[in-house]
């Protein structure tokens, strides 16, 4: 689009749904009220270096919840009480689960707290505390 450098890579967290708001902005169309996400146009044009997204929250049915903050991604599977932790900077393909490593215990607890706050903000009623009583 106009004002956007070709082949310019941006390493900032975003939501996939931001693409809709961005497409509408590029097209010059009015954004409908139901489009809740943000346009990435200021980021793409170099007007800002940050997306404004501090934590990426993920939910898949009643089967999975996740949060990504900085280099860390925590994925919880409440039906089987399984947690997985990845350093996505060092391990972008998420091959080495660090959840059982004693050194990452504090990281997991911090991300879990953040995930609970994001659940509340998104009116997500899935009870993670019952499946993960030791994380809180």
Predicted regions and their residues:
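C-terminal cap/loop subdomain of S1 sulfatases and analogous C-terminal strand-loop tails that border
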Residues: 3-6, 12-88, 93, 106, ...
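Phosphate-coordinating loops and pocket residues in cytosolic domains that bind phosphorylated ligands
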Residues: 97-100
């Amino acid at each position: 689009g106009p004002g956007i450098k070709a082949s310019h890579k941006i390493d900032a967290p975003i939501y996939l749904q931001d693409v809709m708001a961005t497409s509408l902005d590029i097209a010059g169309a009015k954004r409908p009220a139901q489009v809740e996400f943000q346009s990435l146009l200021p980021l793409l044009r170099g007007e800002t270096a940050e997306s404004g997204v501090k934590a990426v929250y993920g939910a898949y049915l009643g089967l999975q919840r996740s949060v990504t903050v900085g280099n860390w991604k925590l994925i919880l599977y409440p039906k089987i009480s399984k947690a997985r932790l990845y350093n996505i900077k060092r391990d972008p393909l998420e091959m080495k689960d660090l959840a059982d490593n004693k050194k990452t215990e504090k990281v997991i607890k911090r991300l879990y707290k953040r995930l609970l706050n994001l659940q509340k903000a998104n009116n997500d009623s899935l009870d993670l505390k019952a499946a993960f009583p030791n994380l809180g």
